[in-house]
Each structure stands twice: as structure tokens, then as C-alpha cells.
Regions:
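Catalytic cores and adjacent flexible loops of soluble metabolic enzymes
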Residues: 1-340
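Metal-ion/cofactor- or nucleotide/acyl-coenzyme-handling active-site neighborhoods
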Residues: 336-535
Length: 535
């Protein structure tokens, strides 16, 4: 019985870098995997659009030919298609020069359609491999029927897919024992694991241990686990395990060279791998795109993310509907409170006074002498925004999300206890004695991805409070390194995908829109330098 390694870095990694690996990387990664004796190399996807050089979204197999140097007869070169997203009429007859095999991935309930696609592919001379996405959704009876269908077709392989990274050992054991018992031994059984619960490598080991003496098997992996969300089982770990424990013959130097030369560069520019958010995806068997949407667009903390995902039905969790998700997010945030008395109290407090907003930017440190002089001279009503700044004495701290509220409470307990706070109702609906709660929907305006920027929300609130003169400090703009922008180096970042330029551009747009809307009723001046200032 054989154990084969299928490296799908160039295919699964395409989720991370939009398939833009570049010609040198593609050639060298394939070459290094060849040198490492990896049995199956997945070169990318087949897609229904024209090929762009240097990407792994191929239109036809010959598009991959320039990247396969010294094609080896001992290696299968594959590409993947979604069962319903590639027109097989475009697929030419197999010529042996590039792609040898095509993997067809299909969702639960679409087995018959996938087999029909597979027949068309095999009729053109290619090997056919199947991927049963979200295999965890299959009942025992479903698994028997799946095996029966595969026995009629006899593909090269059928792979179990832990789509949401939700499997534990008992789940894997249930699935593979039923399939192994019913599946023709001529069909190899594969595993594609995701690392949402840090179990991808462990599941691969269990898979190998369970089946190695009974049938030929295939294990999917990627270099450094490169793949969407929490990523995949890592090629270097799986290859190392097979070498040490199963008499494998993988050249680890070639694998590590591929990582050092190319994957490390992608790791500097892109993010993948285990995180709390993707653990939640695994916990609830939730599509990773839902997690990415909440993280990217709303910087949702783990507690709120769980509440939102729990509010979805099982079926809704497994697909992604961004409009539905946006509505669920707003439902979760928009906890209605009676804030009429709070608004009136705040209006009285700032009546005819200049208001100074102290945002978290580093300029509040570098320009502290100037800012203190302004405070001494003008005696403004001071509101700190989403962070405590111990250089200044404020009248209130304005918090817009639970992450910053809890960080301030836990990091500066004595200062936090001494300060009065203004909270949005997405944090809590009933404030403590020193907390005023304002309705979340009073200050948000939809239509922007990052509509909950704290300074923008503070300015909207001040406009509702009839503030006339507002002075901004620390609204600097975001730099490109983690927390380089903040006065407090440990302040939790709220931009998980590190797209700082895009975030800055959108805040500029939001500020410009707000500035134009309040012109004539509320004057805004910048005390410290800011990329958002309109001059």
C-alpha cells in the first residue's frame, strides 16, 4: 500500500495572493517539489476566463506548460475545477505535456453532477480525482451512497475534505471507516485538512495510521500551510512525518528551499494560519468567507463574532451571503436604548464650549507641549477617543467597541475607574454610574466598509450634540507597521488584514463627506498633522 503526498500550494495558495505567484515562483516551486519527489503536484485552477501570465488561474492545461520544467513521468501534475465553474467544452484532448489529472471539487448534494463532469474530463484523456467538500455533512447513509457512486465511476481518488476545519478524530474515524469499507480498493482515498483548530497535521497522522495497511492513500498539504483562512496541513510537517515514521523518501532540503526562497516572501505580504476567528469558523462549521468579512469589514471581536455566527442557521453558516451577514452584524450591534436624557445632558455639558477630541495617534506624544498649551489657554471640553491617554486629563472617554473598552479597563484599571465614559450601545445597553450610553445607530452611516471608525463616530455624535468648535489631536493616519501609529504601543489593532492604505483612503472619504455635511454648523480644526485634514 502506498502513501502519496499531494502538494496544492499553487492552487490553495491562490486564495491568498489572488493566484499571482509570478513566473519565477511558479517554475521554482514546481521544480523544487519535483526534486523533493512529491508524487502529485497541483499546479493551480482551471477557470473560465483568459489566462494571465504568472498566475495559477489557467484557462486550459497548456497554460501551465511553461512552468513545468523537465516534466517527470513519476509525478502526476494536476489542476482543480469547481464542479459548476468550468466549461469542459473548453478542455482540449490530453496531450501529456502539462496537466495529467483534474480534480473536481463538489459540495454536498452535487455528487451526480460532479460525476457527469468527471466523465467528460475522462473522455478527453485526463485522470479524474474527486473532492467531496464538507464531508462532515454526510450521514453514514450518505457516505455509503457516495462510495457506491465512486465505485461505478472508478476515479483515481476520492478525497475527504474538512472544509471548515471542524473535524476531530472521532469525526474522521467515522467517515473513513465507512468509506474504506465500501469504496473499491482501486480508488485511492485522500484527505484535505484545514487548520482552524490546529488539528490538520494530527488528522493527517491519524488518517495515515488508520489506512496505510488497507489501501493506497493521498494526503493533501501546502508549503507552510499556505491557504485560505487558517490554512492547511503543511507539506514540510507531513513529509517529515512520512520520512521518519513510514520510510518516506522526500527530499526535505528541496521542500525547505522552496519555503525559504518563495513562501517566506508571501508570508511577509499576506496572512494565513490559525487565529481565534478561524477557530470560530471550525467550531460552528462556518464558511471562512463569513469570518473574513466580519474581521475585515468590522474588526469584529471573538465574542460578537460568535453571537453573529450563532444567529445564522446551519445552512446559512456553510455558505456566504454578505448582505445577510451585514444585517446580522447590525442586529448584533444595534441594541436600542433610551438615550434622550444622555443626549440632553451631554448637550448641556458642551454648550458654548470648545471641544477637543484626543484620538490614539502618536502625535499626542510628539506634540504634547503644544497640546498642553492649547488646553491651558482654551480650557476645552476634552474627550479621548477609544483609548486612554495618561498624558492628559479628560472629561470623558468615548468608546465605540468592546475590544478597546476592555483593553482600557484591564490595562489601566485605576485610571479607567476614575474616568467618565461615553459608550455606544453595541458595548452595553446599561452603563455603570460613570457611564453614559448612546444608541449605536445614532452615529453610524452605512455605505462604507469601515463605517465604524471611532473618530468619525465621535464627530457625528458631536454634531448631534450641537457642538460648534471641535479640535482634533492624534487623528494622524495609519502607518504600515503594527501599532506604529498609536501613542500606546500595545493598543489592540483593529485592521486584521493590514490593508493600511485602503483603510486610510476610506477614512479620508468618510471624513470629507462628514466635513462637507457639517460645514457652516460645526467648525473642525486639526491641532496635529493628519493625512485626513482638508486644506
Amino acid at each position: 500500500m502506498s502513501i502519496k503526498l499531494l502538494d496544492c500550494t499553487l492552487r490553495d495558495g491562490a486564495y491568498i495572493n489572488k493566484a499571482e505567484f509570478g513566473k519565477p515562483s511558479m517554475r521554482s516551486i514546481i521544480s523544487k517539489l519535483q526534486d523533493a519527489h512529491v508524487e502529485i503536484i497541483e499546479c493551480g485552477w482551471l477557470k473560465d476566463f483568459d489566462y494571465i501570465e504568472g498566475t495559477t488561474y489557467f484557462h486550459i492545461p497548456s497554460d501551465a506548460e511553461p512552468y513545468i520544467i523537465h516534466k517527470s513521468a513519476d509525478i502526476i501534475y494536476s489542476a482543480m475545477i469547481d464542479w459548476d465553474r468550468y466549461d469542459t467544452d473548453n478542455l482540449p484532448v490530453y496531450d501529456g505535456k502539462s496537466i495529467d489529472a483534474i480534480r473536481v471539487v463538489f459540495p454536498y448534494g452535487r455528487q451526480n453532477e460532479a460525476l457527469e463532469i468527471g466523465r467528460k474530463i475522462r473522455d478527453k484523456g485526463y485522470k479524474v480525482l474527486f473532492q467531496a467538500a464538507n464531508t462532515l455533512a454526510y450521514s453514514n447513509e450518505d457516505l455509503v451512497k457516495l462510495a457506491d457512486l465512486m465505485n461505478e465511476f472508478l476515479p483515481v481518488s476520492l478525497s475527504v475534505v474538512d472544509t471548515f476545519g471542524a473535524m476531530y478524530f472521532d469525526d474522521l474515524n467515522r467517515i473513513i471507516r465507512i468509506i474504506d469499507d465500501k469504496l473499491d480498493k482501486r480508488v485511492e482515498l485522500g484527505l484535505h485538512a484545514h487548520n482552524n483548530q490546529q488539528l490538520a497535521f494530527a488528522l493527517c497522522i491519524r488518517f495515515i495510521e488508520e489506512l496505510e495497511d488497507r489501501r493506497d492513500i493521498i494526503v493533501d498539504s501546502t508549503l507552510s500551510g499556505m491557504g485560505r483562512g487558517a490554512g492547511n496541513a503543511t507539506t514540510e510537517l507531513v513529509a517529515g512525518y512520512i520520512n521518519r515514521c513510514k520510510c518516506g523518501n522526500y527530499d526535505m532540503n528541496s521542500i525547505m528551499d522552496a519555503i525559504d526562497m518563495y513562501i517566506s516572501g508571501f508570508q511577509e505580504r499576506f496572512t494565513w494560519g490559525y487565529s481565534t476567528q478561524y477557530f470560530i469558523s471550525g467550531m460552528y462549521q462556518c464558511h471562512v468567507n463569513n469570518i473574513a468579512y466580519l474581521s475585515t469589514n468590522h474588526r469584529t471581536n471573538a465574542r460578537d463574532m460568535r453571537n453573529i455566527i450563532e444567529s445564522l442557521s446551519v445552512d446559512e453558516r456553510r455558505r456566504y451571503d454578505y448582505d445577510l451577514l451585514e444585517n446580522k452584524y447590525l442586529e448584533n450591534q444595534n441594541r436600542i436604548v433610551d438615550d434622550e436624557e444622555t443626549i440632553n445632558n451631554l448637550k448641556e455639558l458642551i454648550n458654548k464650549r470648545k471641544v477637543m477630541l484626543i484620538a490614539p495617534g502618536k502625535s499626542t506624544i510628539t506634540e504634547s507641549d503644544m497640546l498642553r498649551s492649547f488646553i491651558d489657554k482654551e480650557n476645552p471640553f476634552i474627550i479621548e477617543v477609544n483609548a486612554i491617554n495618561k498624558l492628559y486629563t479628560c472629561d470623558y472617554v468615548f468608546f465605540t467597541n468592546n475590544v478597546r473598552y476592555e483593553y482600557a479597563r484591564d490595562s489601566y484599571p485605576r485610571t479607567f475607574a476614575s474616568l467618565k465614559k461615553i459608550l455606544l450601545s453595541n458595548i452595553k445597553t446599561e452603563g455603570a454610574e460613570d457611564e453614559l450610553v448612546v444608541n449605536f445607530n445614532l452615529v453610524i452611516k452605512r455605505g462604507w466598509e469601515h463605517f465604524d471608525n471611532a473618530v468619525i463616530l465621535a464627530l457625528r455624535l458631536l454634531n448631534k450634540l450641537n457642538a460648534k468648535d471641535v479640535y482634533l489631536a492624534g487623528f494622524d493616519g495609519f502607518k504600515t507597521s503594527y501599532n506604529e501609529s498609536y501613542a500606546d504601543d500595545s493598543l489592540p489593532t483593529l485592521n486584521p488584514d493590514n490593508k493600511w492604505d485602503e483603510l486610510n483612503d476610506e477614512i479620508k472619504g468618510m471624513y470629507k463627506e462628514l466635513y462637507e455635511s457639517v460645514k457652516g454648523s460645526m467648525n473642525i480644526e486639526f491641532l496635529t498633522e493628519s493625512i485626513f485634514e482638508i486644506k
